[in-house]
Amino acid sequence: MMTLQNKEENTMNKITRESLMTLEAYHKARPEMRKRAIQERRIRTVALGEHLNLIFENEFLMRYQIQEMLRVEKVFEEEGIQDELDAYNPLVPDGSNFKATMMLEYPNEADRKLALAKLMGIEHKMFVQVEGQPRVYAFANEDLERSTSTKTSAVHFLRFELPQAAKKSLLAGAQMMVGCEHPEYPMHIEHLPDATLASLVQDLS
C-alpha cells in the first residue's frame, strides 16, 4: 500500500498548472528552452543498434513538450491545460526510476512491418543494469496497451523502477548498462557515455 510519504515523493517532481508559463512568457523564453531541449534530448538518447532508440525523459523535457503543445494548439482554458499535464506528467521520473520513450525506427515501410511482427514483446525485454546489481526490466505502456496480437508498436513508454541498492550505487558513481534481451534484437551498451550517465543520475537525486 502506498504511504503518504510515497505519495509525496511520487508527486514532488510533477509539473503543475501554476508552474507553467503563459503563452506570452513562453514565446519569449522559447528559443533558449528549445536549444536546451535539443541538447538534453541528444545527451539522454541511447541508441541500441541502428533501429532502437531510448529517449530518457525528465522534468524539463516534459515541461518543454507541454509548453510546445499549448503554444501550437493555442490552449488557454484550464481543462485543455490539465489534459496536457495528465498526458505528459506520467513520463516525469519520480526519483526512484527512469522513464523512457522507446522508438523502433525503420525508414522502409515494408522492413518496418516485418520487424514489428518479429519483435513482438520487445518492450518487455528492455533492461538497465547498474554495476554490481541485478538487471531491472521495464514496465511498459502502463497507460494503455500499444501492441496487438500480431505486432509490436513502433513507440513504447517504459519505466525502470530501481531497487534502493541500485539507486545508491548509481549515486555513488557506479556505471550502468542499457540493453535489450529480445532474441531477434539482442543488443546492449556496456557503459553509458559520461554525460548521459550524469544526466540520468540527476533523475534520482
Regions found by a protein language model. Name each.
Residues 1-2:
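Methionine residue identity
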Residues 8-99, 105-205:
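Long, contiguous binding/interaction regions
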